[in-house]
Amino acid sequence: MKKLLSVLFILFGMATLVACTPDEEDPTDVVDPVNNGTIIDFGDTFTQKSKIRVWIDDENGEYMEAVIAEFNKVYPNIVVEHQHMGSVDARELLKTFGPSGNGADVFQFPHDHLAQAVLEDLVYPLPVATQTLLATRTNALALQIATLSYDETNKSFDPASPNAVERLYAVPMSIESVGLFYNTDLVSTPATTFEELFAAADIWNAQIATDGSNLTYAQKGWFYLGTSSHWADSYFMQPIFSAFGFTPFGPNLDDPTAVGFESAETIAALTWIRDQLKPRTTGTGNHNSVSAGANFEAGKIPYIIGGPWNHEAYQAAEGLNYAVAQMPSINGNATQTFAGAIMAAVYKYSDNKEDAIKFVEFLNSDIAMELQYEYKGKLPALKSELLENIEGVSENQLLLDMATQLETSVPMPTIPQVTYYWGPGETMLIDVWNNGVAPATAAATAEASYRTRIGLAS
């Protein structure tokens, strides 16, 4: 019986081995019938994507859509949500929506909002690596405007403050300045000095209009030179002040105690404005009595002081052919305009600063600057030699002329106290232009008004 059981176990074991031996016809690898043998890499599928929100002034969204598409070619795992926000509104709204998490990681604003935004604890200082990158590419004036010396402990922008540190706070996107626009059908060679311009103005203003009114061009309000703003706008008048040696807030434009209204240079400029400029631009009229913008668009006057924001209207004006020249000198002294910039910054309390920094750095790239020019027509805030890389800019003579003007411009003051400069400055010019106030008196009043506003009145 034992022998029989042993035989049965041996036979069962042999049968099992035969059953487990693979058939020679069977494949050695099992192929998934669904993917047909394709090896799938799930790395990208399961990579965690991050998200940032950007507030950029782009109402129809086409510009930002194009920028984000290019950004995602470099950073595919950063989702960028764009919300249109006016550049002059972003700072105030971020103060409201930022703390709740409904603000922006990146926001855009003009140059004169920077210091206030820093004081309001809204701006994250950009790292040294970003500053180094931008130093190789960015227009020097624009970079200067975006850089501040700030003592966070004492909330002071005085470079001499004990804990002051100079940092880059924003990425300049575009840069701008006023210039001398002229009708090329009325002027073949633009004036390079105000003396030359005024000599021609005296002849022009005295001419009789050909419309049958029997009035002179001046009586019609068609003065030889106009302004697209008004003659009490200190931003537009800075070139004139500069020719007499006046720049607000000291030589570095950063000393709030040295606004400079009550200086000999300011008084000399006001005297020239009263005696030389006013008679040839408004006659006996007030600072805002002439509609020079409409006159220039209609082809009725040769010159107007304007900025890049005027191009859209002037280019759309039927029959108007114009160009832009450098601001003329006065008494042999060069005139220096203010350079302004639009910039983008990282919100100080963003939950994703690293990706926000990548985005603002990308805004400085050639492709982002090219898209800004294509969609917005603005002069990229790049070094002049890099403008050649931006398609279309080298053929746009109007922008190139502004770039030339910017070579002698001074950066717009960015200290918070600049907010209190414009009001007294405008009143000072109005008093001299409209009200017959002596320049020295108007300057002293402006100085006192400014000092009262910033709490420095004695």
Language-model features: locations:
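Extracytoplasmic "Venus flytrap"/periplasmic binding protein-like
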Residues: 70-152, 184-192, 293-295, 302-303, ...
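Extracytoplasmic/periplasmic solute-binding protein
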Residues: 155-174, 178, 198-258, 301
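Glycine-centered hinge/linker elements that transmit conformational signals in sensory
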Residues: 200-201, 252-286
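Long, aromatic- and glycine/proline-rich binding clefts that accommodate carbohydrate-like moieties
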Residues: 325, 374-423, 431
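Conserved C-terminal helix/tail region of periplasmic/extracytoplasmic solute-binding proteins
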Residues: 404-458
